Amino acid sequence: MQIKRITEANLPTPWTNFLMIGFEEIKTKCNHIALLHGNMSKNTSILTRIHSECLTGDALFSLRCDCGFQLQSALSHIANEKCGILIYHRQEGRNIGLINKIKAYSLQDKGIDTVDANYHLGFEADERDFTVCVEILNLLQIKSIRLLTNNPNKVNVLTSAGILITERVPLIVGSNPSNTKYLYTKAKKMGHLLNNK
């Protein structure tokens, strides 16, 4: 086990009230949170979003990506369903870190796409490790989910780790002139499913 449950508190939001649970990685001391809403024991397949940290999109309202739009849409979906979980996965910039993400943005300003910018900086296209997310689901005794994602890799990783995914729920929001190339690259080079299927 790489992670432990530390604390919890209520979190009122514009969408609904959530129970916010704080987790800590044992080796790195990195913190992650899970937002829970509704009665998990009464639902056989929990609507779930694994949302990787994006300071620029989530907190600064950047139009360069669709992250902030996805975060808000996921919280709204969970509120409407009256049950669900959002794991806020603290791996900024597909786990290259904030400063390297800004460096990648600088390269994108020069015409390099989001994947090649990572390669240029010495990283893989996606450096994220979803092991912690699997452990959070296991600690919360959630074994069957409906996953809010456009990323087939998340589906594969969670399925391989023993999480039953009964449905992939598309989360296609936030397209705008500033992120058209970014979204095209995610679909073409990273296999993201952006056609609502």
UniProtKB/Swiss-Prot annotation:
Record-level Gene Ontology MF annotations: GTP binding; GTP cyclohydrolase II activity; zinc ion binding
Binding-site positions, Zn(2+): C54, C65, C67
Pathway(s) served: Cofactor biosynthesis; riboflavin biosynthesis; 5-amino-6-(D-ribitylamino)uracil from GTP: step 1/4
Catalytic reaction annotation: GTP + 4 H2O = 2,5-diamino-6-hydroxy-4-(5-phosphoribosylamino)-pyrimidine + formate + 2 phosphate + 3 H(+)
Active site: D126, R128
Gene3D superfamilies hit by this protein: GTP cyclohydrolase II
Domain of life: Bacteria
Primary enzyme class: hydrolase
Annotated family: Belongs to the GTP cyclohydrolase II family.
Function: Catalyzes the conversion of GTP to 2,5-diamino-6-ribosylamino-4(3H)-pyrimidinone 5'-phosphate (DARP), formate and pyrophosphate.
Stated name of the protein: GTP cyclohydrolase-2
Native species: Wigglesworthia glossinidia brevipalpis
Gene: ribA
